[in-house]
């Protein structure tokens, strides 16, 4: 009995992973990680109040990003640096 339950759960898990992979392939998972996607997200977080680069905005060094953001050196965008406060 226990073996059949374990086998059933394993088969369901494999089917879930397979279905998820097929769905991601249909949608084009590379579109989520592309720099074009980051640039489109930049428009959402734009603010006219500050002269610094906002969250997910393009950068080349940490000083270009707003407070509490740091420039990521893989795709060169501003992301949270893990600090809190004002």
From Swiss-Prot:
Q: Where is the signal peptide?
A: 1-21
Q: Which Pfam families match?
A: Toxin_12 (PF07740)
Where Phenylalanine amide occurs, the residues are 84
- Please name the InterPro entries in this protein's record: Huwentoxin-1
Give yes or no: UniProt keyword Secreted: yes
Q: Which residues form the propeptide?
A: 22-50
Any one cellular-component term (Gene Ontology): extracellular region
Keyword Lipid metabolism attributed: no
Q: Where in the cell is it found?
A: Secreted
What is its biological role? Inhibits both peak current and fast inactivation of voltage-gated sodium channels (Nav) channels. Inhibits the inactivation of Nav on DRG neurons (EC(50)=1.77 uM) and peak current of cardiac myocytes (IC(50)=0.90 uM).
Identify its protein family.
Belongs to the neurotoxin 10 (Hwtx-1) family. 37 (Jztx-31) subfamily.
**Free-text note regarding domains:** The presence of a 'disulfide through disulfide knot' structurally defines this protein as a knottin.
Protein name (record): Mu-theraphotoxin-Cg2a 1
**Species classification:** Eukaryota, Metazoa, Ecdysozoa, Arthropoda, Chelicerata
């Amino acid at each position: 009995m226990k073996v059949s339950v374990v086998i059933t759960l394993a088969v369901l898990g494999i089917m879930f992973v397979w279905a998820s992979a097929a769905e991601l392939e249909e949608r084009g998972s590379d579109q989520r990680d592309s720099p074009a996607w980051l640039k489109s997200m930049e428009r959402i977080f734009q603010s006219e109040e500050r002269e610094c680069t906002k969250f997910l905005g393009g950068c080349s060094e940490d000083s270009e990003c707003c407070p509490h953001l740091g420039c990521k050196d893989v795709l060169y965008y501003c992301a949270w640096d893990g600090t809190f406060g004002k």
